[in-house]
Amino acid sequence: MVYHSQFNDESAGFRLVGNVPILPLKTTHKGPAPKGDANSVDIIDEALDLFKANILFRNFEVQGNGDRVLIYLTLYITKCLLKIAPMNKADAEKALFLIAQEQFSIPGESAFPLGGLVTVPNTRDAADTLRQYFTQLRLELGVRLCQRVYAVDPSKANKWWICFSKRKFLNKAL
């Protein structure tokens, strides 16, 4: 059974850009996401917690807007794990920072892999907000992923994380 996001409740009042909710984050990185409560689980914690279970599935029925962010983060985790597999923690942190900052596609651009799941932002400002939000997510996820993958030994990646790096989620990649 696939695990879905706890942020699917549309009555929670999260701001939407297209059909992507701008969810609160526990982060120091600047961006459009509101500050999250330090004691609660945010979407990045949720994506990391559910990654190993969800990566095993080829199908994912979207039950709400929070699932769209969860799918994007799951694909991004896979990309990150492929990149950091042979690295130590310091090199991995640098590599993930660079990956987060590189140019990437957003909904409405031809290279965006989730074109059918995520609607195109209706204005240029909305597209810029979405790009900033995805960048903020990518930066914070890189930091937290390194904390988990290198928790035991900073000189090498944990094999129980890296073994999932070659799996394809929804047969897509970022």
UniProtKB/Swiss-Prot annotation:
Example GO molecular function: actin filament binding
Alphabetized UniProt keyword annotations: Actin-binding, Cell projection, Cytoplasm, Cytoskeleton
InterPro entries named in the record: ARPC3 (IPR007204), ARPC3_sf (IPR036753)
Phosphoprotein recorded as keyword: no
Top-level taxon in the UniProt lineage: Eukaryota
Primary localization: cytoplasm
Example of a GO biological process term: exocytosis
Listed GO CC annotations: Arp2/3 protein complex; cell cortex; cytosol; pseudopodium
Location relative to the cell: Cytoplasm, Cytoskeleton; Cytoplasm, Cytosol; Cytoplasm, Cell cortex; Cell projection, Pseudopodium
Protein function: Functions as a component of the Arp2/3 complex which is involved in regulation of actin polymerization and together with an activating nucleation-promoting factor (NPF) mediates the formation of branched actin networks. Seems to contact the pointed end of the daughter actin filament. The Arp2/3 complex is involved in organizing the actin system in cell motility and chemotaxis, in phagocytosis and macropinocytosis, at late steps of endosome processing, and in mitosis.
Recorded family membership: Belongs to the ARPC3 family.
Quaternary structure and partners: Component of the Arp2/3 complex composed of arpB/Arp2, arpC/Arp3, arcA/p41-arc, arcB/p34-arc, arcC/p21-arc, arcD/p20-arc and arcE/p16-arc. Interacts with carmil (via the region between the LRR domain and COOH-terminal proline-rich domain); carmil is required for Arp2/3-dependent actin nucleation. Arp2/3 complex, MyoB, MyoC, and the alpha and beta subunits of capping protein all form a larger complex with carmil.
Protein name as it appears in the record: Actin-related protein 2/3 complex subunit 3
